[in-house]
Amino acid sequence: MSLFFKPVISPQWSFPVLLKIGVRSYAGGPRTKHKGNSPLASVPTGSSNKNRKQKAKGKKGNKKNDPDQAFNFGEYGGLKKDVEMNMDSTNKLIQKISNFDQLLILPPVRDAVKEIISKESLKLQDSRKKTSENIIPSPIQTVAIKRISKNLMDPKLQIHAIAAETGSGKTMAYLIPLIDYLKRQELETPELWETLRKNVLIRSIILVPTHELVDQVYETVSKTKTLLGLNSFKWDKATSYRDLLENIKNRIDILVTTPGKLLNLFSIRMITRPDKVLSKVGFVVLDEADTLLDRSWLEETHSAIKRIPNINHLIFCSATIPQEFNKTMQRLFPTVVPIMTPRLHKLPFALDFKVINSALSPFKGSKIKALAQTLYAISNDDTEPGFEKRCIIFVNEKKNVPEIVNLLNKKFGHNAIGLTGEDTFEERSEKIMPFLSPPRPLSEVVAQSTSPPTSLKKFEIPDSNIVIGKLKNTNSNGTAPSNKSLHVLVTTDLMARGLNFKGVRNVVLYDVPKTSIDLIHRVGRTARMKQGGRVFMLTDSKTKSWAKALPKIIKKHQRLS
């Protein structure tokens, strides 16, 4: 029985059913044992097999017209059948709330939130019209704030799981209740605040799986210093113990770090009572929780949580709910309350998904030629006028990254860099920065092309839904002499989790993802927050049958299963 599928309190309650999707296999990683019986053990299991068969028979005729029917085409990636989601109450709430003024947030926090979102929006190409006056909450922000704020200052432990599609504003969905919680402590309990204000302590913690995510989340959190007077601090690989100690002495309101770093707090000799430093932490968030609770992370993450004795709010946040994550939540945190949006596990509305079969002419089985021609078409079309173009290429195996980068640069004249887990933290930070930053205007980009602009001759690839451009004065291999105006990053799933590639409009899936989880996260690096974006999936004779249905499911708004 799964926590996200059955009611926790009574049969009359019905939490939204959460679909099960395939999960990746991880080597090793101990499982944490959970003592005691889950309160779910006595929950009724629902209809009998006979009733289920009758219901299935009755619905069979309407299968094609069901908008919530999950995509289950082919067997590649171990896709599993979905179940319907009951989202009536969530939909009504989303339709009812049209601005932040309708949400239970302190006025200073509300103003600060609008300012932060407005500044973030101004960094994007098509969001220049947004100001703090017309900023509205996204669906997941509406639902999360409404439900968490209902009992925000209740001292008992409250556990929530926020789950929504990629690029939907999940960071602010948990950050707004967190900030509101801290400011209400100051305003509503002045005596308590007086004991905390000048003490050596940490008040809240945000845990993420990578140091890149530490930097990204901290960039947003740090804006609360000038707007609300909150002291935030990031603890990553570049942070010295001395810097950490100095900030703890001055009170850290929001600490952003990884579970491993947090556990290191107990091995720093200069801190004699690390347990006391964490004793006032009341709000803890696990961002990218499906990663932090998978088999390779579970022991470390669970150990970090257990070191925080007085948690008031524990928030799990994720864009996908894999089966293994669902089981882990049920075992370790059986009272968790799910908060989800109707578009969970659906690909973005604004996504343009194209499938290219490299087995056909003119590529004749060469995926690298199909990739080079796709990049060339991107660099020469009329999209993103006035801005530098960027593209992220995802591969399944890190060993293939150097070879692809070398071929793109030396044989096909592209401007590509590779990034894998073997790079140092400093190298990764330097390589990824141009993609995490807003797109640069072309006036700021140094011209690197070795050939002048040339007119395009278009042709359509057979058995494909993509039109490729071709230069009249190409090299013998059919590519342009140089395509330096397009900045290309070749990487693995290391960079597919949580990172906000600001304004990146193009993603290429060089390999078909192994699971629907990987597909959602890779595709989610573009078309974020209702921006436009394109995904080009390269297939071959083995994977074309599974991939060809993906463009249709986006148009039909179907859910991946």
Curated annotation (Swiss-Prot):
Lineage: Eukaryota, Fungi, Dikarya, Ascomycota, Saccharomycotina
CDD domains linked: DEADc_MRH4, SF2_C_DEAD
Name of this protein: ATP-dependent RNA helicase MRH4, mitochondrial
Gene Ontology cellular component annotations, sorted alphabetically: mitochondrial matrix; mitochondrion; nucleolus
Residues spanned by motif Q motif: 117-141
Region Disordered, residue ranges: 29-72
Domain comment as written in the entry: The Q motif is unique to and characteristic of the DEAD box family of RNA helicases and controls ATP binding and hydrolysis.
Name of the gene: MRH4
Transit peptide, residue positions per record: 1-26
Note: Present with 736 molecules/cell in log phase SD medium.
Organism (species): Saccharomyces cerevisiae (strain ATCC 204508 / S288c) (Baker's yeast)
Residue span, Helicase C-terminal domain: 370-561
